[in-house]
Regions:
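Predominantly cytoplasmic-facing regulatory/coupling regions of multi-pass membrane proteins
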Residues: 1-86, 132-203, 229-286
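Transmembrane helix boundary and interhelical junction motifs in multipass membrane proteins
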Residues: 62-68, 94-104, 203-219, 247
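Helix-loop junctions at the membrane interface of multi-pass solute transporters
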Residues: 70-72, 104-113, 127-128, 222-224, ...
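Membrane-interface alpha-helices at helix entry/exit sites of multi-pass transporters
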Residues: 79-82, 100-101, 111-128, 136, ...
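Hydrophobic, aromatic-rich membrane-embedded alpha-helical segments
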Residues: 81-109
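Hydrophobic alpha-helical membrane segments of integral membrane proteins
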Residues: 105-106, 121-124, 132, 206-208
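Interfacial segments of multi-pass membrane proteins
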Residues: 107-115, 194, 198, 215-235
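Short polybasic/polar patches that bind polyanions
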Residues: 108-109, 180, 202, 209, ...
Length: 286
């Protein structure tokens, strides 16, 4: 199934994205000093706030998975979480939103009824429209904070908008926690700008895992608000790192669940310890 979804076009886009990253890496005159200072600044980031951001990212994934489950009417909640997680895992490494295609295929396979592909396609479109509306509310809230009340009205529109709105709130909380971790003033207002910037960068996901583009979009959005380059880059790097690590962990668990491969308890314990150690290590490093 994955071979059909991750076709030659995706592989070419991935190669092009990696080539772009390699070019930047081999041209030290481009942002070398700023990037170096940004990584140094991450040493002073608050580990506690980064943990909070990780928890918020996890909540956002569960809410997004619930939106897909509501749209496709899957009976098994855990199964829906797992299928959504596999898409998150693919998006962590592949460009062009390949994870969404994987997600579409997995949910279509499990959707009830005769028109499985149509049901999954409607779910993808419905979630996308709801997410776009929520992003619009966030942009409006940067000028009129009272607009955030509109997110509270989402349950009136149905379960899908409700879960998408909840995921949006969780993403804003994650962004605010990252901003607080690196010392950005007014972290909540910053988060209201960062989340739409990330979604805009997602339209040009030509690099694997959108590496570089997402951090750059965050940095540009923060600089427009007067945040210095070093802090802006630190925020972008920290946000992408925590989100990616959470996505990989969530997706790996989903893949393991769907594969139904018998795994010894010692292996599960060992894998859990490795993931925990990697997470703690990353928090210490940044």
């Amino acid at each position: 199934m994955f071979r059909d979804i991750l076709d030659r076009r995706t592989i070419l886009l991935s190669a092009a994205g990696l080539a772009g990253v390699a070019v930047l890496a081999l041209m030290p005159q481009l942002f070398r000093d700023q990037l170096g200072e940004a990584f140094v600044a991450l040493e002073d980031a608050s580990t506690g706030w980064l943990w909070v951001s990780a928890a918020a990212f996890i909540a956002a994934l569960f809410c997004s998975a619930s939106a897909w489950r509501a749209a496709t009417k899957l009976p098994d909640r855990i199964d829906a979480y797992a299928r959504y997680g596999v898409g998150s895992l693919v998006n962590s490494f592949a460009p062009a939103h390949a994870g969404d295609a994987v997600r579409l295929a997995l949910f279509a396979k499990a959707s009830p009824g005769d028109h499985k592909c149509l049901t999954a396609g409607k779910a993808l479109a419905g979630v996308a429209v709801a997410r776009l509306a929520c992003v619009g509310v966030l942009l409006l809230a940067t000028m009129k904070p009272i607009a955030l009340v509109l997110l509270l009205l989402a349950p009136v529109l149905g379960r899908v908008p409700m879960w998408v709105a909840a995921a949006t709130v969780a993403r804003v909380a994650a962004a605010a926690a990252v901003a607080a971790a690196v010392g950005v003033p007014a972290p909540v207002l910053t988060a209201l700008l960062v989340v739409p910037a990330i979604d805009l960068a997602g339209l040009f996901a030509i690099t694997p895992g959108n590496i570089g583009l997402k951090s750059g979009a965050i940095a540009i959005a923060l600089q427009a608000q007067g945040v210095d380059m070093t802090t802006a880059l630190s925020t972008g790097i920290a946000f992408h790192a925590v989100e990616t690590l959470v996505g990989i962990t969530f997706g790996s668990a989903g893949t393991l669940y769907l594969s139904r491969v018998p795994v010894p308890r010692w292996a599960v314990g060992g894998a859990t310890a490795v993931v925990a150690a990697a997470f703690v290590g990353s928090m210490v490093l940044v």
